[in-house]
Design a protein with these regions (language model features):
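Detector for repetitive beta-architecture
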Residues: 201, 221, 226, 231-233, ...
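Extracellular beta-strand/beta-solenoid scaffold signature
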Residues: 206-213, 228-237, 248-257, 271-280, ...
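Small-residue-enriched hydrophobic alpha-helices in membranes
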Residues: 1-75, 79-207
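Intrinsic-disorder/low-complexity peptide segments enriched for small residues
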Residues: 5, 9, 16, 23, ...
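Cyclic nucleotide-binding regulatory domains
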Residues: 216
Length: 427
C-alpha cells in the first residue's frame, strides 16, 4: 500500500501539472481576442450536410463537458473557420442538439475544478483517445505552429495519463485527418491496430457507408467503412476510384474481383462463400480479416492473391471436396504473415499435386499457424485404386499437402494437430 507521504507527493504532482496546464491556457488566451466574423449559421448548415456520423462523443454521459474542454482549444486569438466547422461536424455526427458555440463563454472562464471535472468525465466514458485526436486536429487546422497550444494539449494528455506511444499515434492520426491523406491513413492502420478506425474513419470525405453508390464515387481513394452486405458479386475494376479500401465491413456470400485497382481489406469478415472466389485481386493489402465457412472448387479457390500483403488474418472451416481443385488459398508474389488456419480441410483426393495453400513466385509465408487442418480424406479403397492406376502408368501419384510451394519461402510455420503431408514442392 502507498504511504500517506507517497499519496501527498502524487497529489502535489497532479496539482503542479494542473497549474502548469492552466498557465498555458491563460497565456494562450492572453494572446488577444479577435472579434469573430464567421457565419455560424452557414457553418452549422455545412456540418449538417457533412457530419462526422458515428463520432464516439455520442456515447458521452455528459457531452457538454466533452465539448467544453474541446472548446478551450479555440479560446485563442483568431480561431479559424476550419476549426469551427470541424467542431460543428463533430456535434452533428454525435447528435448533440445544442449549439456548441453557446459554450464558448464557459470555455473562456474555465476553472481548475471544471477542467478536472471534464477530464474525469472523458476518462470515465473511455473517450480519452477520441478527445485528444479532436484536440490535435483542431490544433493542426490552425495551419500555423502554436507552441502554447501544443504545450496545453500535452498537459491535458499528461493529466489523462496517456502514455507517450499513444500520444505519438494520436498525432499521426490527426495529421492524416487534417491533411485528408487517406492513403497515409490506411497505411497507418495497416501497421497499427484496426481498432483505430472505429474512432477515425468517419473523418475522411472519401469515406462512404453506401456500397450501392460507391461505384460512382470519382475519387482517387475511396474508403468503404462499416458496411454489411450479402449475396453480391462485385467487379472493382468497374468502379471509378483508383484505390479502394474496405474497413470493418461484414460480408456474406460476397465476391470481389480486380485486376487493375489497389484494394485493401482491413478488419473485414467474409463468410459462407461457396464455389466462388471470395477475393481475387492483383495488388493490395488484407489485414485483421476473418474468412469463415467458405468452399472452394477447381475453378474458384477461396482467395486468389497476387502482389498482396496479408497479415493477422484467420481462415476457419474452409474446405474443398473437389479432386480437381489445386488449393483453397492461392497466393502469388504475396507475403502472408501471422495468419491462422483452423479446420481447413481438403477432401476427395487429387488429380494433380494439391495443397490447402498454394504459394508461388517468391511468395513468403511466415509466422503462420495451421491448426486441425487435414488433406486427402479418401477411403482406403480409393487410395488403393489410385495407386494401381499411377503405378501402371509409371508416373508419380499426385499428393495433397497443407502447403504446396513453388519458388517460395516458409519461415516459422507451425502445424498443430494436423493430418496429412505438411509441405511439398510443385513439380
Amino acid at each position: 500500500m502507498e504511504t500517506i507521504a507517497q499519496l501527498q507527493s502524487k497529489l502535489q504532482e497532479a496539482a503542479d501539472l494542473l497549474a502548469s496546464v492552466t498557465r498555458e491556457l491563460d497565456a494562450h488566451r492572453n494572446a488577444g481576442a479577435a472579434a469573430e466574423s464567421f457565419d455560424f449559421a452557414r457553418l452549422r448548415c455545412d456540418a449538417e450536410n457533412h457530419p462526422y456520423t458515428g463520432h464516439p462523443a455520442a456515447r458521452s454521459s455528459m457531452p457538454e463537458l466533452y465539448y467544453l474542454l474541446l472548446l478551450t482549444v479555440l479560446t485563442t486569438a483568431e480561431a479559424k473557420e476550419a476549426q469551427w466547422l470541424h467542431l460543428y461536424r463533430i456535434t452533428k455526427g454525435a447528435d448533440y442538439a445544442q449549439d456548441v458555440h453557446d459554450l464558448l463563454p464557459a470555455a473562456h472562464a474555465m476553472t481548475d475544478a471544471q477542467m478536472v471535472e471534464c477530464i474525469e468525465c472523458i476518462r470515465r466514458d473511455n473517450l480519452t483517445r477520441a478527445f485528444l485526436i479532436d484536440a490535435m486536429i483542431l490544433t493542426l487546422l490552425r495551419e500555423e505552429e502554436d507552441t502554447y497550444l501544443l504545450e496545453y494539449i500535452a498537459g491535458l494528455a499528461a493529466l489523462m495519463e496517456v502514455p507517450p506511444a499513444e500520444i505519438t499515434e494520436v498525432i499521426q492520426l490527426a495529421k492524416c485527418v487534417a491533411s485528408q491523406d487517406s492513403e497515409r491513413y490506411i497505411e497507418f492502420l495497416g501497421k497499427s491496430s484496426i481498432e483505430h478506425a472505429k474512432e477515425t474513419a468517419f473523418y475522411f470525405h472519401q469515406m462512404t457507408d453506401d456500397l450501392n453508390s460507391a461505384v460512382h464515387h470519382n475519387t482517387k481513394h475511396l474508403i468503404i467503412a462499416n458496411v454489411s452486405k450479402r449475396n453480391t458479386q462485385i467487379n472493382l475494376d468497374e468502379w471509378k476510384a483508383n484505390r479502394i479500401s474496405f474497413v470493418m465491413c461484414d460480408f456474406e456470400n460476397m465476391t470481389f474481383k480486380s485486376n487493375q485497382k489497389h484494394v485493401d481489406f482491413l478488419g473485414c469478415t467474409f463468410k459462407k462463400v461457396y464455389h466462388m472466389c471470395c477475393i481475387s485481386i492483383n495488388n493490395g493489402t488484407i489485414k485483421d480479416c476473418v474468412f469463415d465457412d467458405c468452399k472452394a472448387d477447381a475453378k474458384s479457390p477461396v482467395i486468389r492473391l497476387s502482389n498482396v500483403e496479408i497479415s493477422n488474418t484467420e481462415f476457419t472451416h474452409c474446405i474443398t471436396e473437389d479432386a480437381d481443385a489445386n488449393c483453397l488459398f492461392e497466393v502469388d508474389q504475396t507475403t502472408m504473415t501471422g495468419c491462422r488456419f483452423t479446420y481447413c480441410i481438403r477432401k476427395g483426393g487429387a488429380s494433380s499435386d494439391a495443397g490447402i495453400v498454394q504459394a508461388t513466385n517468391n511468395s513468403i509465408l511466415q509466422n503462420c499457424i495451421f491448426e486441425c487442418c487435414s488433406t486427402d480424406d479418401r477411403d482406403p479403397l480409393s487410395i488403393s485404386m489410385s495407386s494401381i492406376i499411377w503405378t501402371t502408368s509409371r508416373k508419380k501419384a499426385p499428393t495433397s499437402s497443407i502447403l504446396l510451394l513453388h519458388n517460395s519461402i516458409v519461415k516459422n510455420v507451425t502445424f498443430q494437430s494436423c493430418t496429412g503431408e505438411k509441405t511439398q514442392q510443385m513439380s
